Amino acid sequence: MLTILKNKVTTEHLEFEMPDGFIIKIDPITKDIGMQFRNAEDTIHLAVYDDVYEEDDDYIKEDIEFIREDGFYDLMEGPFEIERCGKKGLGCVYRTKGHQFEFYEARFFHRGTSQNRETDIVISTDIGESSPIKSVKYLFDIPGIKEFLKKIVIHS
């Protein structure tokens, strides 16, 4: 069971402070999720592609190169394979430089369909509804994700 220590709703995003030190920020429109440690200088984002097949690899590689060339981003890891709800997809972890968190700057899209906001970054409609709290728990159900992100933050 996920415990929410603090829930602050603003006009821009939902913010949750987690027991393990993560601050979760969710954009209610694009469903982008950002993760940040208390006092961290960088915001860590996890982008997940659901149902990505081999023929999409070129598009994903182009997307990653685009982020690498953009000075605002620092790609940390990926793409790597993630399995959720029995489905396999590709994911990638990256961070925005500095304290500012900008949801509209997210550049990963599900199979290239940037118009389909429901299949954008991280939150999937596989869980039956786009409830932020359920989606945060869903994200943290990914095996090893917390340890993976902690390692990135500590050593970056």
Model-derived regions: residue spans:
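Short aromatic-glycine motifs in intrinsically disordered, low-complexity regions
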Residues: 5-17, 137-140
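Short glycine-aromatic motifs
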Residues: 2, 21-27, 73-76, 89, ...
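Short, solvent-exposed coil/turn segments at beta-strand boundaries
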Residues: 17, 21, 39-43, 85-87, ...
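Signature of long, low-cysteine stretches enriched in small and polar/charged residues
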Residues: 63-117
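Short, hydrophobic/aromatic-rich segments at coil-to-beta transitions
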Residues: 1-7, 31-32, 83-93
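Surface-exposed amphipathic alpha-helical segments
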Residues: 22, 121-156
